């Protein structure tokens, strides 16, 4: 039933195991043995401190990494949020376009130029971005391209509207170098202007052949989520590596196009350098989802800590099971964390030499010296320390027992009983088990004290406590709560069962005479009150004790030496 078993009698050992061992082996052997044990435990403690220090070092590495990762994530999240905002605006514009004359004129202009090899529609260069497009013939040649869409006019006006938002969202302080909307219907809007109309087809097909566009087909991106892509420079090209975050634009289960933002790797490198604490060692490295190196916080040695294939395999294996962690690689410790708003990993590489020069290296050296000093002092002063510890242990055990028990009856005292009762009542309430309380008060105890003296009264209390303890179940708890008053806690017992236990206590107390003086015996009795949580559903121990106490006094008024389990009988 999950009820804690409580022992009602506590044995006091006369001698500790150290004294028994000393009697058998002699003080010298005991001292030597204790010295070995303490030395062993001091070594284990030092080892434990080393483990804690290592954990603190790992936590420090992770905290430094987390601070930089959070700062980078914050900026990336800002750009992702802008992208989602632009997509929502695009969807609204597709469903309910603005009824402006300039937008209607733009649709008319599109119909006039849609057959041209390249065309451009511009409303106001100072307020919005132009829409650049290619001919119907060129669109028909693309696998993913199509103008067979009833909402094509709405998409044209929506592109002009989102061009206004793109112009507002793009600024020089942003990490984003270019923001664009690329449509499957053969046109695009970009914050990077197309100076010559003849360059529109080349630029458009450069967009629609990129992975960040193709990867948003309904087959490749079924969840229509934000995705990140990395472009690496080719040997014959001066194109700077960059990452692109993009999201598909859909409406009524139709894929219109892709909204994207391109971030140069050099911008992310500059941000890493600004985000890290200049007083801290270690190098930060950014990798994409395929663990391809993107950039490092160390511009002087950009390839100094790049991992070999075996180390990359170890990292990939560790990243399969968690979003953050750390791993030791030879003399380096690598902590890593997946970014929330970028499909990649930020790693921090800390070498052994950097660790030794740091605070944790100094602490490790100091800890070793302290262990050596402690061992030397232990060798000189062990005998005195052993005696102090032994005496303090005996004193502590004695004080603890006295704090929880009544020394006369060897039962729990009032404070300890209340401490035991509350968790037992809560446990019974949790499992919907009954919880009962018995209050016991010895009859005419004051008369025994007055007639035979307090020494006889103490014998009566000790005798009664022993009989009460022997009448209880294993899980019951008994304590002395007053002069001649006892309380019994019965977890799991209903009112009927508690009344049976109370009757058993009453009979045991009353059926045996006890010798209190030479040729003088007396028979004692007690009045008992019983209460249970099943009566009112109340598991409050103090309330149940008060109810049992009231019934105890009803038993007193009814003639004593009886059990009252209700207010009527």
Curated annotation (Swiss-Prot):
<dbReference type="InterPro" id="IPR043128">
    <property type="entry name" value="Rev_trsase/Diguanyl_cyclase"/>
</dbReference>
<dbReference type="GO" id="GO:0005525">
    <property type="term" value="F:GTP binding"/>
</dbReference>
<feature type="binding site">
    <location>
        <position position="484"/>
    </location>
    <ligand>
        <name>Mg(2+)</name>
    </ligand>
</feature>
<keyword id="KW-0812">Transmembrane</keyword>
<keyword id="KW-1003">Cell membrane</keyword>
<comment type="function">
    <text>Catalyzes the synthesis of cyclic-di-GMP (c-di-GMP) via the condensation of 2 GTP molecules. Cyclic-di-GMP is a second messenger which controls cell surface-associated traits in bacteria. Involved in the regulation of cellulose production.</text>
</comment>
<keyword id="KW-0135">Cellulose biosynthesis</keyword>
<dbReference type="GO" id="GO:0052621">
    <property type="term" value="F:diguanylate cyclase activity"/>
</dbReference>
<keyword id="KW-0472">Membrane</keyword>
<feature type="binding site">
    <location>
        <position position="454"/>
    </location>
    <ligand>
        <name>substrate</name>
    </ligand>
</feature>
<dbReference type="InterPro" id="IPR000160">
    <property type="entry name" value="GGDEF_dom"/>
</dbReference>
<feature type="domain" description="GGDEF">
    <location>
        <begin position="433"/>
        <end position="568"/>
    </location>
</feature>
<dbReference type="InterPro" id="IPR033416">
    <property type="entry name" value="CHASE7"/>
</dbReference>
<feature type="transmembrane region" description="Helical">
    <location>
        <begin position="365"/>
        <end position="385"/>
    </location>
</feature>
<dbReference type="GO" id="GO:0030244">
    <property type="term" value="P:cellulose biosynthetic process"/>
</dbReference>
<keyword id="KW-0460">Magnesium</keyword>
<dbReference type="GO" id="GO:0046872">
    <property type="term" value="F:metal ion binding"/>
</dbReference>
<keyword id="KW-0997">Cell inner membrane</keyword>
<dbReference type="InterPro" id="IPR029787">
    <property type="entry name" value="Nucleotide_cyclase"/>
</dbReference>
<feature type="site" description="Transition state stabilizer">
    <location>
        <position position="446"/>
    </location>
</feature>
<feature type="binding site">
    <location>
        <position position="458"/>
    </location>
    <ligand>
        <name>substrate</name>
    </ligand>
</feature>
<dbReference type="GO" id="GO:0005886">
    <property type="term" value="C:plasma membrane"/>
</dbReference>
<feature type="active site" description="Proton acceptor">
    <location>
        <position position="484"/>
    </location>
</feature>
<dbReference type="Pfam" id="PF17151">
    <property type="entry name" value="CHASE7"/>
</dbReference>
<feature type="binding site">
    <location>
        <position position="449"/>
    </location>
    <ligand>
        <name>substrate</name>
    </ligand>
</feature>
<dbReference type="GO" id="GO:1902201">
    <property type="term" value="P:negative regulation of bacterial-type flagellum-dependent cell motility"/>
</dbReference>
<comment type="pathway">
    <text>Glycan metabolism; bacterial cellulose biosynthesis.</text>
</comment>
<keyword id="KW-1133">Transmembrane helix</keyword>
<feature type="transmembrane region" description="Helical">
    <location>
        <begin position="25"/>
        <end position="45"/>
    </location>
</feature>
<dbReference type="GO" id="GO:0043709">
    <property type="term" value="P:cell adhesion involved in single-species biofilm formation"/>
</dbReference>
<keyword id="KW-0808">Transferase</keyword>
<keyword id="KW-0547">Nucleotide-binding</keyword>
<keyword id="KW-0479">Metal-binding</keyword>
<dbReference type="Pfam" id="PF00990">
    <property type="entry name" value="GGDEF"/>
</dbReference>
<feature type="binding site">
    <location>
        <position position="441"/>
    </location>
    <ligand>
        <name>Mg(2+)</name>
    </ligand>
</feature>
<comment type="subunit">
    <text>Homodimer.</text>
</comment>
<protein>
    <recommendedName>
        <fullName>Putative diguanylate cyclase DgcQ</fullName>
        <ecNumber>2.7.7.65</ecNumber>
    </recommendedName>
</protein>
<keyword id="KW-0342">GTP-binding</keyword>
<comment type="pathway">
    <text>Purine metabolism; 3',5'-cyclic di-GMP biosynthesis.</text>
</comment>
<dbReference type="InterPro" id="IPR050469">
    <property type="entry name" value="Diguanylate_Cyclase"/>
</dbReference>
């Amino acid at each position: 039933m999950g009820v804690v078993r409580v022992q009602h009698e506590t044995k006091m050992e006369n001698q500790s195991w150290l004294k028994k061992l000393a009697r058998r082996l002699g003080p010298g052997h005991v001292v030597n043995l204790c010295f070995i044990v303490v030395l062993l435990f001091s070594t284990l403690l030092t080892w434990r401190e080393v483990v804690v220090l290592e954990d603190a070092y790992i936590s420090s590495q992770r905290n430094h990494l987390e601070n930089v990762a959070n700062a980078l994530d914050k900026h990336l999240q800002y750009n992702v949020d802008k992208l989602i905002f632009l997509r929502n605006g695009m969807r609204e514009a597709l469903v309910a376009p603005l009824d402006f004359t300039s937008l209607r004129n733009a649709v008319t202009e599109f119909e006039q130029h849609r057959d041209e090899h390249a065309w451009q529609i511009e409303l106001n260069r100072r307020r919005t971005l132009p829409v650049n497009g290619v001919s119907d013939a060129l669109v028909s040649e693309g696998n993913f391209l199509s103008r067979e869409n009833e909402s094509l006019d709405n998409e044209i006006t929506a592109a002009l509207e989102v061009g206004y938002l793109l112009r507002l969202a793009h600024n020089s302080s942003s990490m984003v170098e270019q923001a664009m909307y690329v449509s499957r219907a053969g046109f695009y809007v970009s914050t990077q202007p197309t100076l010559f109309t003849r360059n529109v087809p080349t630029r458009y097909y450069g967009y629609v052949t990129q992975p960040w566009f193709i990867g948003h087909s309904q087959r490749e991106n079924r969840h229509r989520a934000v995705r990140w892509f990395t472009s690496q420079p080719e040997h014959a090209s001066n194109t700077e590596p960059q990452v692109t975050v993009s999201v598909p634009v859909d409406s009524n289960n139709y894929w219109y196009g892709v909204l994207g933002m391109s971030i140069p790797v050099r911008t992310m490198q500059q941000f890493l350098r600004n985000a890290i604490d200049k007083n801290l060692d270690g190098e930060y490295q950014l990798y994409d989802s395929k663990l391809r190196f993107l950039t490092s916080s160390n511009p002087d040695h950009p390839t100094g800590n790049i991992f070999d294939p075996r180390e990359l395999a170890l990292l990939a294996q560790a990243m399969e099971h968690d979003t953050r962690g750390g791993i030791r690689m030879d003399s380096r410790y690598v902590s890593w964390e997946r970014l929330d708003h970028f499909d990649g990993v930020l790693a921090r590489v800390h070498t052994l030499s950097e660790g030794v020069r740091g605070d944790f290296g100094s602490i490790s050296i100091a800890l070793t010296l302290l262990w050596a000093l402690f061992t030397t002092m232990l060798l000189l002063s062990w005998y005195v320390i052993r005696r102090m510890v032994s005496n303090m242990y005996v004193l502590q055990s004695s004080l603890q027992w006295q704090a929880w028990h009544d020394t006369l009856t060897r039962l729990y005292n009032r404070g300890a009983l209340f401490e035991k009762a509350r968790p037992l009542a809560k446990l019974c309430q949790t499992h919907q088990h009954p919880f009962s309380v018995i209050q016991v008060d010895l009859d005419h105890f004051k008369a025994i004290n007055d007639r035979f003296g307090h020494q006889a009264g103490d014998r009566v209390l000790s005798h009664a406590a022993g009989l009460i303890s022997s009448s209880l179940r294993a899980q019951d708890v008994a304590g002395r709560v007053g002069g001649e008053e006892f309380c019994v806690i019965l977890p799991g017992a209903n009112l009927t069962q508690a009344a049976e236990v109370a009757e058993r206590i009453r009979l045991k107390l009353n059926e045996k005479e006890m010798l209190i003086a030479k040729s003088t015996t007396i028979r004692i009795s007690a009045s008992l009150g019983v209460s249970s949580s099943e009566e009112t559903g109340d598991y409050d121990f103090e309330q149940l004790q008060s109810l049992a106490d009231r019934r105890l006094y009803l038993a007193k008024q009814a003639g004593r030496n009886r059990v009252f389990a209700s207010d009527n009988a």
